[in-house]
């Protein structure tokens, strides 16, 4: 019988694919294969594979380039960590000059300056360090808080949110501003006359808070984010409080004269003195210039965002602040959004011809009642479409109104008959509006200045009138001792 191949030799390299293949061939019936022939075939096969270059293992892709960080929600970190310790050293030096190394709220001006913060950050710094619980803060309490702020917040917006806001929150709600603004009332020289009238502290604070959210909270979310603070001028206004003794020059947010105008306008409408107004009260604003259909939309909840339960069919003082700011200055983005929400009946983000006709129908009736022949709706529609130039014919979006720059003219044509007719008369006469006013002042600033002068003159005349009726109800900002209501809380 033929001698079989040396199986033991083949097993010396069992991982060799050629050996495995040879063994498989033998298993399928290798009795017909002569040993010499098989060994020759195996030798030739190995020689061929020995000359082949072993394929290199697959290479991993080249490492990607490191993308530098570009998103800093809390501000860009400082280039040197040592900057934090230097800042802490300045704070510790400030506490060394205080009695017992502790700071009360009255001492926080020195600490705020040592922190490199504006003066009126003193109350937020004090309360963030736990001063409200103990009445004062030690250097250890304050340094522990301030080190965390410096390590996690790297610009003014992030630090302001961290100091005023609740732990873990990335934004500020309205209640967060109350301690800060109360300190402004208590310590700013321009508000010294207001400190004795404690009943009106909450009214002033509520007004300022609503103005802050009206201007800064562009998302209408009810929470001011760090990015919204960065894009606004609010922090610059807070810094300006330190160098501007006349609070009335701070027209963006803090002006007392502006508060006086807003509150007096509300007081004139709130006949029952419950600090709320209903539809009939609001209908008297501006001698009934605003249409009833628009008033219904204001009370529908389209532009009110109170988190607390409200009285049905009532507007709070905070709601009225938004209404008055929007009505008297229709050039601001928030005003455009306010009235657009009111006119967008179906909430689809566009004003259709049906919605425009719905509001103009009452406007035309009110013009006819004043002896003015109104334009047919189709003629007015062509005029406003030419005015706005919407991207989609027959549908006006919020973006269209903001881009055209004539949102005030558009809105007045549909729900404020007095302003619409006054504008038409000026255009026919060829006279510009407010020729004697400051061109840099906003429409709201001009309105507030005119109304404040009128209210002051009205009070002066009432005081000089010896025949003044004692039973009448003049507007008295400080003489409301008979008012039976709680302090107005910011909504």
Curated annotation (Swiss-Prot):
Expressed in testis, kidney, liver, lung, spleen, brain and heart. This is Serine/threonine-protein phosphatase 2A regulatory subunit B'' subunit delta. GO terms for molecular function: calcium ion binding; calcium-dependent protein serine/threonine phosphatase activity; chromatin binding; protein phosphatase regulator activity. PP2A consists of a common heterodimeric core enzyme, composed of a 36 kDa catalytic subunit (subunit C) and a 65 kDa constant regulatory subunit (PR65 or subunit A), that associates with a variety of regulatory subunits. Proteins that associate with the core dimer include three families of regulatory subunits B (the R2/B/PR55/B55, R3/B''/PR72/PR130/PR59 and R5/B'/B56 families), the 48 kDa variable regulatory subunit, viral proteins, and cell signaling molecules. It comes from Mus musculus (Mouse). Residues 331-366 form the EF-hand domain. The keyword Calcium applies. The B regulatory subunit might modulate substrate selectivity and catalytic activity, and might also direct the localization of the catalytic enzyme to a particular subcellular compartment. Interacts with retinoblastoma-related protein p107 (in vivo). May target PP2A core dimer to p107 resulting in dephosphorylation of p107. SUPFAM superfamilies: EF-hand (SSF47473). InterPro entries: EF-hand-dom_pair (IPR011992), EF-hand_13 (IPR041534), EF_Hand_1_Ca_BS (IPR018247), EF_hand_dom (IPR002048), P2R3A_B_D_EF-hand (IPR048855). The keyword Calcium applies. One of its GO terms (biological process) is negative regulation of cell population proliferation. One of its GO terms (cellular component) is protein phosphatase type 2A complex. Keywords: Calcium, Metal-binding. Residues 460-473, 481-491 have a biased composition (Acidic residues). Ca(2+) binds at residues 344, 346, 348, 355. Residues 460-491 are annotated as: Disordered. Pfam families: EF-hand_13, EF-hand_5, P2R3B_EF-hand.
């Amino acid at each position: 019988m033929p001698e079989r191949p040396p199986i033991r030799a083949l097993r010396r390299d069992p991982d060799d694919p050629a050996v495995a293949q040879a063994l498989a061939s033998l298993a399928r019936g290798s009795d017909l294969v002569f040993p010499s022939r098989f060994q020759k075939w195996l030798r030739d096969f190995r020689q061929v594979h020995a000359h082949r270059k072993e394929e290199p293992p697959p290479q991993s892709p080249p490492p990607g380039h490191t993308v530098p960080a570009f998103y800093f929600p809390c501000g860009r970190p400082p280039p040197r960590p040592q900057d934090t310790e230097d800042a802490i050293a300045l704070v510790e030096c400030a506490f060394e000059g205080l009695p017992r190394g502790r700071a009360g709220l009255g001492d926080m001006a020195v600490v705020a300056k040592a922190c490199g913060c504006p003066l009126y950050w003193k109350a937020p710094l004090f309360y963030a360090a736990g001063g409200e619980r103990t009445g004062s803060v030690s250097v250890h309490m304050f340094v522990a808080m301030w080190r965390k702020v410096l390590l996690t917040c790297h610009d003014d917006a992030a630090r302001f949110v961290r100091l005023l806001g609740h732990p873990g929150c990335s934004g500020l709600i309205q209640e967060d501003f109350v301690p800060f603004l109360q300190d402004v009332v208590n310590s700013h020289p321009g508000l010294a006359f207001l400190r004795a009238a404690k009943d009106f502290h909450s009214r002033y604070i509520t007004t300022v808070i609503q103005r802050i959210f009206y201007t800064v909270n562009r998302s209408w979310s009810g929470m001011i984010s760090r990015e919204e603070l960065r894009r606004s001028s609010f922090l610059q206004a807070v810094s300006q409080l330190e160098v501007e003794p006349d609070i009335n020059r701070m027209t963006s947010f803090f002006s007392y004269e502006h508060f006086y105008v807003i509150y007096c306008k509300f007081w004139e409408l709130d006949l029952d003195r419950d600090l709320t107004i209903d539809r009939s009260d609001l209908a008297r604003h501006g001698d009934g210039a605003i249409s009833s259909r628009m008033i219904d939309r204001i009370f529908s909840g389209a532009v009110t965002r109170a988190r607390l339960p409200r009285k049905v069919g009532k507007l709070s003082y905070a709601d009225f602040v938004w209404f008055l700011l929007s009505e008297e200055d229709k050039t601001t983005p928030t005003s455009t959004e306010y009235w657009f929400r009111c006119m967008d009946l179906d909430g689809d983000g566009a004003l259709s011809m049906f919605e425009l006709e719905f509001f103009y129908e009452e406007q035309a009736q009110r013009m006819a009642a004043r002896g003015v022949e109104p334009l047919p709706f189709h003629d007015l529609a062509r005029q406003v479409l030419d005015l706005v130039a919407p991207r989609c014919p027959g549908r006006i979006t919020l973006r269209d109104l903001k881009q055209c720059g004539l949102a005030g003219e558009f809105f007045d044509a549909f729900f404020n008959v007095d302003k619409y007719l006054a504008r038409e008369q000026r255009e026919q006469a060829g006279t510009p509006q407010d020729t004697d006013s400051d061109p840099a002042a906003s429409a709201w600033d001009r309105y507030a200045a005119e109304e404040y002068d009128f209210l002051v003159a009205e009070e002066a005349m009432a005081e000089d009138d010896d025949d003044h009726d004692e039973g009448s109800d003049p507007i008295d900002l400080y003489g409301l001792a008979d008012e039976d209501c709680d302090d107005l809380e910011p909504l």
